[in-house]
A protein has these predicted regions:
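Short runs within selected transmembrane alpha-helices of multi-pass transporters and secretion channels
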Residues: 1, 132-134, 151-181
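Transmembrane helical elements of multi-pass membrane transporters/channels
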Residues: 1-80
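Alpha-helical transmembrane segments of integral membrane proteins
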Residues: 10, 14, 18-22, 120, ...
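Lipid-exposed faces of alpha-helical membrane segments in multi-pass integral membrane proteins
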Residues: 21, 25-28, 67, 123-131, ...
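Hydrophobic alpha-helical transmembrane segments and immediately flanking/interface helices
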Residues: 39-59, 128-149, 157
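Specific pore-lining/lateral-gate transmembrane helices of multi-pass inner-membrane transport
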Residues: 58-140
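Short juxtamembrane and helix-loop transition motifs at transmembrane-helix boundaries
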Residues: 113-119, 144-151, 171-176
Length: 181
């Protein structure tokens, strides 16, 4: 109260080791392949000091992460708005003693919003993957990267698309985590 900056999240009663572990493992999974390419001398070059870059890996990874922009937009609209709207109504009704009919209706809407959101993310990401597969050879050629790296781009695009789906599912699970109620 009246503080400009608060570190209440670090209080022991608000610290959830399982959530910390999930976040840590999620981020390690995202970054481990990059560190492998950056710090394996045959696939990387020194940039400044201990920083390294891998031209053959970094550009396909960058392109694959560009391909998730449509899926992230759908995620933001469907999960972070539609689902959260019904989530809030559901828990407000539960806490304030709403009718069983209304609570069940909000639960059904919440489930429907999740189904719609995940379905739309899957459709949009599949389309983004297919477009990247088709445009991949031209993209690599325009960037001066050998077409031998096309399979790497394909794997990265599919992986990035799956990452969007995993992030959406984890987000729903985090919302439904009842420790914070």
């Amino acid at each position: 109260k009246g503080r400009l900056i608060a570190f209440d999240f670090a209080e022991r009663k608000l610290l959830y080791p399982s959530l910390v572990l999930v976040g840590l493992l999620y981020n390690v999974a995202i970054w481990v392949d990059k560190f492998m390419f950056w710090y394996f001398p045959p696939t990387s070059e020194p940039i400044i000091g201990g920083l390294r870059a891998s031209l053959i890996y970094d550009l396909p990874v960058f392109l694959s992460y560009l391909s998730i922009i449509p899926g992230m937009a759908v995620f933001l609209v469907r999960i972070e708005t539609d689902f959260v709207e019904y989530y809030d109504k559901f828990y407000d009704a539960v806490r304030s003693g709403g009718s069983l009919e209304y609570i069940e209706s909000m639960r059904d809407e919440m489930v429907y919003a999740i189904q719609q959101g995940l379905g739309e993310i899957a459709k949009i990401q599949t389309l983004a993957v297919l477009v990247t597969f088709v445009a991949g050879p031209a993209l690599l050629d325009a960037l001066g990267i050998s077409s031998l790296y096309l399979p790497l781009l394909h794997v990265q695009v599919v992986g990035a698309g799956l990452q969007v789906g995993l992030m959406a599912i984890l987000n729903v699970f985090f919302y439904l985590d009842q420790r914070r109620i």
